[in-house]
Amino acid sequence: MKKTVVLLLLVSTSFLVWGQKKDFNEIVKFYGFISNDASLTTRQSVSVREEVILVLAPKPIVLDNNGNDINKTPSFNFTGINSRIGVSINGPDAFGAKTTGVIEGDFLGISNETKFNFRLRHAFLKLDWEKSQLLVGQYWHPTFIAECFPGNVSFGAGAPFNPLSRNPQFRYTYNLGKVSLSATQLTNGHFTNKGAEDIQKNALIPETHIQANYKTDNFIGGIGLGHKILRPQIVTANNYITKERVHSNTVYAFSKMKTTALTFKAYGIYGQNNDNLIMMGGYAALDKIYSQDQINKGIVEYTTYNSLSSWIDIHTNGSTFMAGVFAGYSENLGATKKVDVSTFMGRWDNVKDMMRIAPRLVFVSGKTTIGTEIEYSLANYNKGNPAGSTQEEITGYDAYGNVTSTEAADNLKFILNFTYYF
């Protein structure tokens, strides 16, 4: 205990001596924003924290006893829980590198039960050498490109068409002039895949990504590839250890180009089991002939669902006024092997595809912005037919989990946002 106290005093003294040589504002910087939204939706929606703040998709058609659509009910809300605060610290050099530490949070909590509570967003340190960088801690998932994401007024950066996740990770980046290469290993954190809480931890191997970027003054583009392993169970319902795992791959590409008048952004991702990114995806048990030993022990094998998502975002460049539009599309491509659809774990297996288009206007004065946006979303949900003559007609799914019979549900969201940055 005494040794720990002495060590802390030595570190604190060293930091204070170093800090005296620099202005406090050069060392510690507080930043963030105070944001408040007024939102109106024409339909009940799947949303984050049930605050109409991050509307992901319109809810499906559900009829009451009179044949009226229950979810065709509008809602309105004021909220400011996405307000954010962070601190960035430029510390003394370490291991021959410049050091930076960041802690950032907001008030969304990590579930509906904890909304309005403080939530950790980022908590990382960076070691910057001349040509390379090591980032350790919680930061954006590699599929989320901090220099190329939608500029929506609505909170959520284009989710579920754009990945949205922050994860504990190790990320090493090497710079080759205009080209940079990075490798990342990460775990889920509180952005988890559906299923058991420790579904990734028990797989033992972190999710791994590699990425290559090309950047100039007015352009950035890149490609990336990721691999993830999950272990849905460690013991079966019949009390036998099972070691079955789910392997999934993701590939993505992005670009951003800036001209004098306009900025163009585009992104596309094809992947498996990406529900931890708040996107379509998941896994299910294989529909196959199992051995008698597997049946006796209750062991099942799994496969992933595939999905495709893409978006474009265009906006004008201005210091006091910007107009823009976002358009996104996602499609559920089912599995490559036959599955038992009743065992699916993930997001939106009951949706064939979904789209969104959202024009916006943003007014800027000093550190204050006023933004308004109209967001139209549509999702084609599974619609089975109990009177059908085949299993596919009855359930609305084929043997590979593809949705074959649909009905559309759509929603309009109107938003007015006031934000003060500091």
Spans of model-derived segments:
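C-terminal beta-signal and adjacent terminal beta-strands/loops
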Residues: K367-A399
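Outer-membrane beta-barrel "beta-signal"
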Residues: T406-F422
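Short sequence motifs at beta-strands and strand-loop junctions characteristic
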Residues: F24, K72-G80, K115-N117, F161-L164, ...
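Outer-membrane beta-barrel translocator domains and adjoining extracellular loop/strand segments
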Residues: Q44-R49, E113-N117, A146-S154, F191-Q200, ...
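Detector for outer-membrane/organellar transmembrane beta-barrel domains
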Residues: N218-V351, M355
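A solvent-exposed, charged loop/short amphipathic helix patch at secondary-structure junctions
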Residues: R49-N68, Q391-Y400
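Outer membrane beta-barrel
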Residues: D23-E50, I61-V62, G67-F191, L204-I205, ...
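Bacterial Sec-dependent N-terminal signal peptides
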Residues: M1-K22
